[in-house]
């Protein structure tokens, strides 16, 4: 059995914190939250460029990896589609956490940061949203490896 075994709450200072991966949730309307707009400025408009293209539509479960470029301490950015803003629920925040965990696991990234997915669309407390996202991270990273003969190390 293998899974993500540690989730910590931490503020992210994009200008100084070094992360292998930062995960942001994007709705189908592609409207960035205030925090995401700040991230976009640090990334020199790279998030807006990706959203202007039609490849990433923000559909639930859709993902897009972005390499932000030189001079930015975050190595990779993962956009996670959240679906329609008006239909977003706390369970979909949990699902987005699972999607982020699986994508990080595929790339063997042990440490990564996620935002509170869909915080602007939910009436829940920050604690409830954080719990749902953390549950999604843990459940999404779960792998049953008991009977596998070729066990890969799991992030």
Where are these regions (language model features)?
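Glycine-/small-residue-enriched capping loops at alpha/beta junctions
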Residues: 1-155
């Amino acid at each position: 059995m293998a899974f993500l075994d540690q989730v910590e709450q931490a503020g992210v200072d994009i200008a100084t914190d070094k992360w292998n991966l930062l995960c942001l949730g994007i709705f189908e309307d592609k409207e960035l939250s205030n925090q995401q707009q700040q991230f976009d400025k640090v990334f020199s408009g790279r998030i807006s460029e990706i959203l202007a293209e039609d490849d990433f539509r923000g559909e639930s479960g859709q993902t897009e990896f972005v390499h932000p470029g030189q001079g930015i301490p975050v190595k990779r950015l993962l956009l996670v589609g959240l679906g329609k803003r008006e239909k977003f629920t706390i369970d979909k925040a949990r699902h987005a956490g699972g999607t982020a965990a699986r994508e990080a696991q595929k790339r063997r990234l042990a440490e990564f940061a996620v935002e509170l997915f869909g915080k602007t669309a939910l009436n829940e407390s920050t604690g409830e949203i954080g719990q749902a996202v953390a549950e999604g991270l843990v459940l999404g990273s779960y792998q049953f490896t008991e009977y596998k003969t070729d066990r890969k190390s799991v992030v």
